[in-house]
């Protein structure tokens, strides 16, 4: 029989394993973070879009995504930026090549009207925000954001089970 202390330690290690799993995937191959949610949509509509994105990710031949929550500065159609919290999907490239993986993730971002998607093509390499619509990144096609940094927060960060990480 476990003591309460052993139980709490086991629960904490389980929470960290998901972040650890994402970090391991990032070190072993390409990963991307993409979302279907928009700040101007209702909660129910955003939830339905996220569920549809799950199906679309598998439909593109990618392995299933890990669901996370993220914060991002979203640029509206009028040019104003607003901070939004959204449900995001961390996708690994699986056996897909770098170029095909990048195109698949960008097409998902375009389909759901996202400003950009975060793509890390090389194992353990630096990631970049890739624009998926005109004006999404203020005119730039891509912005290099750096390597994954678990346990840190920034202006755009991601959280999974209480643990945060960012690229920078």
Q: What do the predicted segments below correspond to?
A:
Residues 40-44, 96-100, 126:
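Short, surface-exposed beta-strand/loop "edge" segments at domain boundaries and coil↔beta transitions
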Residues 59-96:
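Short, intrinsically disordered low-complexity segments
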Residues 99-124:
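Short, compact, well-ordered microdomains
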Residues 120-135:
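Short proline/glycine- and acidic-rich turn/helix-capping motifs at secondary-structure junctions
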